[in-house]
C-alpha cells in the first residue's frame, strides 16, 4: 500500500525467517472470504501478500528483530550482520498481538511441563512437527482453542474437554460445530481450571463450575487426567516497542490510540491491525494495513492525508453456542460466507427444502451438510529437509473419511522444493480430491 501510494523506499522488518507472521502456523482454512472472495488457508493468504511485496519492490529484512523505536522514528535492529539503525520518514507498527500467559491467571498448583498457550502448541504441531501431548484439556474457548482441539484430535490426541469460564464461547459458531461437535469434544461452559496436578509433567487438572461472580462453586470440583493443559484465554496487542517511543496506549484494549488514518499520538508513527485492537478476521487487518501504509507514504512525502473509506460493509461472523439450540438441532450454520445464516433443512417428498438461507449456495451447503457432510482437510506433511509443509485437499472430502485420509498423508514424505498449489497426492482415498501444497518452500 505504501509503495503504491508513491513511497520511494519501503522496508519490511520481520523477526521470523519468513514473512507472514502468525499466518504461517494457521494452516486451517477460513481466510480471505472478504479480501479475495474465496476461502484460503493462513499460509496461502500470507503467500499472496508476500508475492505482492516482491512485485512492488519492497525490501524485506527477515530474521531481524527491532529492539528499539524512538519518538523521532529511529528504528534500532539486530540480525546476523550485527546491530544497525534506520532513520525513517514514517513508521507503520504491525506487530500483531500476543497470548495471555499462565502468569496472568490464578492457577493453583506446581509449574510442571505441559502447560502452554494454544498458540505455542499450534507452532509446535504445525511448524515444528512436535506433539506437545496426548491427553489434552483446553482452558478457554476462543477460536484458537477450538481450532487446536480439532488439530490435536486429527493428530491422534484425545481432547478431554474445552473449559470456558463464561456462559458462552467467544469462538465463532462454525468453529464450535466443525472443531468440537464434529469430533464429540465436550464444551464445558461456566467451568474453569482451579488446580494443575503434577510436578515434572502435568498429570491432571481439577475443574469446577463457577458462579455469577466467576468464583468456583464448592463441591463441583472434578478431576480430569491429562498430560497437557492448553491456554486460550485471550490476546493482548503487542505494545512494548510503542511504549518506548511514547505512543499512547488505550487502557481498555491495551492497543495503540490512533486517528482515522491510523496515525498514533506520535507524529509519523502509524499502527494497524491487532496492535490497535484484536480483530476477528485477517481480512480486516489487511484493510487497516492498506490505510496505514497509504497514510504513512503521504506523511513521508509531505502530502495531505486523505482518509481511506473501504466500500465493503464489515460483517462479523456469528459467535458462541447461542446460535445453536442443542446437539439435535436440525439447523445448519452456513459457512460459505461470513454472514453465517442459520438454515433449517426439511425432508419432503421430492427432496429437501430449506429455510433461513439468503442464497442458493447456502441452500446447497445446508442440504449437503444434512445428507453427506464434507470438510476441507488441512494438515502438514513431513519433508526430506525436516521442514513441515502445510497441505490441504483442493475440495471438501466426506467427513467420515478424514481419519483414513490423515493416515495416508502421514505415511508420505515430501521432496523439496515445492510450490504453492503443487499436487502432492491425486484422488486421495478415492474421494476425487487432490492434496495440494499451501506454501512454497525451497531447499
Task: For each feature predicted by the language model, list its residue ranges.
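Residues forming the flavin
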Residues: 1-325, 334-342, 347-353, 357-363, ...
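A general structural signal for short secondary-structure junctions and capping/turn motifs
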Residues: 107, 425-428
Amino acid at each position: 500500500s505504501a509503495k503504491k501510494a508513491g513511497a520511494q523506499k519501503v522496508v519490511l522488518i520481520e523477526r521470523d525467517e519468513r514473512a507472514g507472521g502468525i499466518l504461517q502456523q494457521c494452516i486451517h482454512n477460513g481466510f480471505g472470504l472478504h479480501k479475495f472472495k474465496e476461502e484460503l488457508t493462513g499460509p496461502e493468504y500470507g503467500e499472496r501478500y508476500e508475492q505482492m511485496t516482491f512485485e512492488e519492490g519492497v525490501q524485506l529484512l527477515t530474521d531481524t528483530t527491532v529492539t528499539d523505536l524512538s519518538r523521532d522514528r529511529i528504528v534500532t535492529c539486530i540480525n546476523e550482520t550485527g546491530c544497525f539503525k534506520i532513520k525513517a520518514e514514517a513508521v507503520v507498527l504491525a506487530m500483531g498481538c500476543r497470548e495471555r500467559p499462565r502468569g496472568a491467571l490464578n492457577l493453583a498448583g506446581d509449574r510442571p511441563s505441559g502447560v502452554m498457550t494454544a498458540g505455542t502448541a499450534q507452532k509446535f504441531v504445525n511448524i515444528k512437527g512436535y506433539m506437545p501431548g496426548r491427553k489434552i484439556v483446553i482452558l478457554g474457548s476462543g477460536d484458537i482453542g477450538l481450532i487446536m482441539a480439532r488439530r490435536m484430535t486429527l493428530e491422534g490426541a484425545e481432547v478431554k474437554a474445552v473449559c470456558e469460564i463464561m456462559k458462552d464461547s467467544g469462538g465463532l459458531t462454525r468453529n464450535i460445530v466443525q472443531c468440537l461437535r464434529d469430533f464429540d469434544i465436550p464444551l464445558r461452559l461456566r467451568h474453569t481450571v482451579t488446580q494443575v496436578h503434577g510436578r515434572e509433567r502435568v498429570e491432571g487438572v481439577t475443574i469446577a463450575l463457577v458462579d455469577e461472580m466467576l468464583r468456583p462453586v464448592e463441591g463441583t470440583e472434578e478431576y480430569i487426567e491429562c498430560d497437557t493443559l492448553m491456554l486460550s484465554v485471550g490476546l493482548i496487542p503487542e505494545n512494548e516497542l510503542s511504549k518506548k517511543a511514547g505512543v499512547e496506549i488505550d487502557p481498555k484494549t491495551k492497543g495503540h490510540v490512533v486517528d482515522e488514518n491510523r496515525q498514533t499520538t506520535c507524529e509519523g508513527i502509524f499502527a494497524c491491525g491487532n496492535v490497535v485492537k484484536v480483530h476477528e478476521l485477517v481480512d480486516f487487518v489487511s484493510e487497516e494495513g492498506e490505510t496505514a501504509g497509504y497514510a504513512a507514504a503521504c506523511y513521508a512525502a509531505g502530502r495531505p492525508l486523505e482518509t481511506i473509506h473501504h466500500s465493503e460493509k464489515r460483517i462479523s461472523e456469528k459467535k458462541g453456542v447461542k446460535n445453536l439450540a442443542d446437539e439435535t438441532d436440525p439447523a445448519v450454520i452456513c459457512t460459505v460466507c461470513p454472514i453465517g445464516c442459520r438454515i433449517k433443512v426439511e425432508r419432503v417428498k421430492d427432496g429437501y427444502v430449506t429455510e433461513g438461507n439468503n442464497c442458493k449456495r447456502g441452500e446447497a451447503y445446508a442440504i449437503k451438510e444434512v445428507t453427506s457432510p464434507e470438510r476441507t482437510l488441512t494438515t502438514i506433511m513431513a519433508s526430506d529437509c525436516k521442514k513441515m509443509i502445510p497441505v490441504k485437499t483442493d475440495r471438501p472430502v466426506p467427513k467420515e473419511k478424514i481419519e483414513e485420509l490423515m493416515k495416508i498423508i502421514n505415511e508420505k514424505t515430501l521432496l523439496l522444493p515445492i510450490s504453492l498449489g503443487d499436487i502432492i497426492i491425486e484422488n486421495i482415498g478415492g474421494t476425487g480430491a487432490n492434496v495440494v501444497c499451501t506454501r512454497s518452500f525451497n531447499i
